Amino acid sequence: MRLRETAPWLALLALATGCFLAWRWLSRAMFERNPQYAIRRVEISPGFAVSEAEIRDVTGLREGVNLFSFSAAEVRNRLLLTKRNLADAEIAKTLPDTVTIVAHDRIPAAKLCSSRLALDANGFVFAILPRDAERYRAVPLIENGASPYRPDAGRTLSDSPGTPTGVEARVMRALRVALLCDRPERAFRLSNLDVSNPTYLVLLTGDNRVIRLVWEELVDDTAILQGLSMADDTLRDPASRAHKRFDVVLSAGKVFGG
């Protein structure tokens, strides 16, 4: 009796399995094994960080590969995991025979204790390739005094609200300062940011003037912008040329020259 009750379900399952296998065979015959969909053009926009040859090597996409034999998302993920100097990549298939790859370079927002190590705007650590050293020569350098801080490439540094404590948090807060300072209307350009002092973030400008900001006051972007604006207004004043060091104290609403 039980066999008689289950027999229709078993037949239905067998039919569904057969339909699925037939669909898979037909799909491969029509698409994955169809020479009509063999790649004839691979169009690559490589940027600067990765060459066209490197992209071809990592992705494995070349003339003759079938468009339906690979997942564009999986190939993209492999490319980004292999080439950390890329921030993003777009891989698109265009029927019947074209693949387009657009690579987007990871742009350094600051160097980190070395001309060869950098942070992007999100705190991702990556190496600056020798061929890119001159291109990023003007990117400001975050330093930690006599104790260089060199986290492994591939990490993303973290920050927390409030007063930054610890080297990593101070580095991330200095990164925010560098990003918020990078505006064409500023009266000064940052060259170095030293996070080694537990009380002050020490900024060195391109014309060798020193600006000190109090860590306890750099609690968020609003406070950072206020401090930079105060420094900006002070350095625009012709009277500031008599000074080389400027202490920005938000709580007092003043900049003290020395």
Language-model regions: role of each:
Residues 44:
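Extended, alpha-helix-rich binding/interface surfaces that flank or overlap catalytic cores
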Residues 1-41, 57-58, 64-78, 87-258:
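Charged, solvent-exposed interaction patches on well-folded alpha/beta domains
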Residues 82-83:
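Acidic-histidine catalytic/liganding microenvironments
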